[in-house]
A protein has these predicted regions:
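Charge-dense, helix-prone N-terminal extensions
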Residues: 2-167
Length: 167
């Protein structure tokens, strides 16, 4: 008798599964219909991207930069990669970082686009903006500023040959 009961329950279960599979869905499963949320913008207008190493998080950061900043971010990234082959990338503290493996970080950009040279006082000519940190110098790029790519590339090349900042 127990055998007949288990056979009946197996048949009933098989019918339920077949009936469910045959019914068309009214909506897509939630995992398919979810839209990828855009990163939140922080108070300074920068995208909030999770801390991670590699090119992908830096590209996500650049893609999420608002308006004119996105174009500057792409240009900076291209210039840095062209100037320092094999450059290491990461996002830390909601900012993209660029460095040399085993030597630390050499620069970052944030805000309006603020390029931070961590050993900037060793660069010639000095990047224009001073910092409260004795070795750091900045290049601030605003929406209508012309970007001197030759000078920026020279600073990036010089910075890549100096000891980096360990973070």
């Amino acid at each position: 008798m127990a055998n007949k009961t288990s056979i009946r329950s197996k048949k009933a279960a098989a019918k339920r599964v077949a009936a469910k599979a045959a019914k068309p869905r009214k909506t897509e499963p939630k995992s398919w219909s979810r839209k990828v949320a855009k990163p939140a913008l922080l108070a300074g207008g920068n995208p909030q991207i999770a801390k991670a190493d590699g090119d992908a998080p830096v590209q996500a950061y650049i893609a999420a930069m608002p308006g004119w900043k996105r174009d500057i971010g792409r240009r900076l990234d291209t210039l840095i990669v062209r100037t320092v082959p094999g450059v290491r990338k990461a996002v830390k503290w909601n900012s993209p970082f660029y460095g040399i493996d085993g030597q630390g970080w050499l620069l970052s950009f944030t805000r309006y686009v603020k390029v931070a040279f961590f050993r900037g006082t060793s660069l010639r000519p000095l990047p224009p903006a001073a910092s409260k940190h004795k070795d750091v110098r900045y290049l601030d790029i605003h929406e209508d500023d012309a970007l001197d790519e030759a000078q920026l590339a020279a600073w990036v090349k010089q910075a890549s040959q100096l000891p980096g900042e360990r973070m």
